[in-house]
Amino acid sequence: MNSTFKVVFNKARGALMVVNEATSSVQAKGTKTVIAAAVTALMAGGAMAALPSDGVITNENLKEVGTTKLTSGMGQTVTIQTNGNVSQLIEDLKAVKDAQEEAKVAALRKAFGYDKEKNHSVMVGVTGGWNLMDETTAKIAAIGLLTATQDAEVVKKFASQTGYKVDDTLNLTGGYLDQTNSFTSDRETSVIIGDVDGTSSPIVLGVVGGSNYLSVSKNNANIVQNAGSTVTINSGNVAGVVGGSLTVLSPHDISFNGEGTGAEEATRTQLFTSIESTALNIGGKANVGGFVAGHAGIATNGSKIDSEVKNGTTVNIKFNDEGLDPLDGLVVGGVAGNVVVATGKSEAKATTNGQTIVNIHNGEVMGIVGGGAAVSFDMGGTLGFLLGSGSGSATTQSDSVIMNVGAKSATAALMGGGIAVADANGKNNGSASSTAKFVELNFEGPKALNENDKVKLHKAATTYLPKFREDIKSQNFSQLVADFTGFADQVDIPGVHVANLGGGSAIARGYFVDDEATGTATANSKVDSVSMTFNGGYNVATAAGGLAVAHDKADASKAANQTNATANVDKVNLIITGGENILFTAGGLAYSTAEKRDGASLAKATANVGSAEVLVSGGTIDGLLGGGIAFDNVNGKATNAVANTESVTIEVTGGEINAANVDPITKPIQGEHAGVPSRGSHVHQVAKTLGKDGANVAILGGGVASGAGAESTIQNVKLLLNGGKVNDNVFAGGLATLGG
């Protein structure tokens, strides 16, 4: 490979061009050098891995495998039983950050590689299926890789891993895609990380159960797996898991030495991907950060992605009951459905047919979304210039979601529905929608928590939450890890379930700062029916409806309602048979805020619940609300946050209901009470008013509104106190405060 190639972006033509510098020249003016950055960075430590015949990779055979990068099974089970040291990885990543530009590639090689002593390695990109690219994209990647590494053998290994052969002039032949740019497989795919006994402790960054597909050309494609995928994580530390396929579509006009690719141009470059079903099993002695049980797709530059899981997704979390270290058994951040991202005026849609099932047997589990996640955002800047300006349209759909939360687990921030996030700037429009037909959440736990554990929980919250804010603000990642380690150790108390949401979330963020900014940011979440059952446990802060958040950065001259977040739940059933339950509402949550809290922003957050039925037959409840909660942090002249509930029926046949002890909330959260109230002051005042030092509320039939532009409405309230014991005050109506 004696030729020297360069990838450039021609502004005048609006196209990527690949030139042979030995035969062509490109004027520097009006061009920008662009090397397939994602591939090059990923490949900084070497070529793709060659899978051993038995499919098992260990520290001992990594030298024969050749690299730690981009292992693919192509239908054969891939088993990773390497060993890695998290502290070493953090130290190496810090070295990458601190390195001079010319030394960053070498630092990356060290961070994402393996040592000669065979006691530390980091695996990057493990795939049960295939690494797929169309020929144009593979050639762009090969040129970028050759430019970065100056190593022809690396390029040849890369090409072989994507099904191609490459000659000395970088001509490619072969590939896994057929003549119609499609790929179909009837083979099941499987990835296994670690072992149940924990004799291996891999570090793995990026696991895909299905296949990867990357394209920068304007070729339409179909990626179909007529079988299921399974990812099993038994030990080690794993970040970034996709149960289905991972697809990235960023179409460009491609020119090789001034000649086009010959591809027919479509109105929108389209990609369809499908898989039969997916299963994600997390257990043993593992830790997992960030998973998507279904597909993950990113559409840019005016493209369109359509993904489906034909027959459901399953997530099982069950760690070893004995022999766990204090920091084993941790899962942070996950989506049980599909995830789609759209930017650059693109469209992305994903559907999960059948049931989505999440079983949490034990461990510490935080931030799990039962439905799908749809994200549209306005990239802007240099990346926006390359990947398409403007926001996009993203949609996810789920049939039914069932989440079973076991008595041996400690959980926080579980959500039954999906999440929709829309972001837009200037004249651009961004929309996101996430829907689910039926959501069921079942919580188990002890009848009561002992007082020592309660003190331990409250102390952990007041000690570490301020530290997290400071660590993030100062970008001190190593200290954040240390503080999170201490926090996780303190809150690992079985049967504690904090911040539970029955419906989905809608988050809209607008940046419309002048009269010419006529765009919109619209996020919608919808669940037809939610059923939540609490049979036991120490359950704190539960809303059966959805969550709507609207954030705006508007000048006083803006008068259009451009930033809207709406979370809808048609029907709610909230059933409490046991446990200790603190601050429950059958309604939804609406929160609106703005960077300029001068009363001019008309960002709007709306949480709607149709009918809500609450049945209390056992356990204790400290603070039960029938309606929703609306916080307006805009200080608006108009209504910015609304929580609507059509009808509520609360029936008490057993158990005991009291006013809440809100000291754990009001003591650490004070806020600004003078002038324009802050977010903290709204929380503080509402909690104080509800609690024993305020109105001493056991049951509030209506909802809560806090802030000048907040409303909480309810049409019909029915309270049936047929049994049990109510020790404090009962109000059929609602509560309103100014928040400061």
Regions found by a protein language model. Give the residues of each.
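Gram-negative bacterial Sec-dependent N-terminal signal peptides
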Residues: 4, 8-49
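Surface-exposed loop/turn motifs in large extracellular/passenger domains
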Residues: 51-206, 211-240, 245-367, 373-584, ...
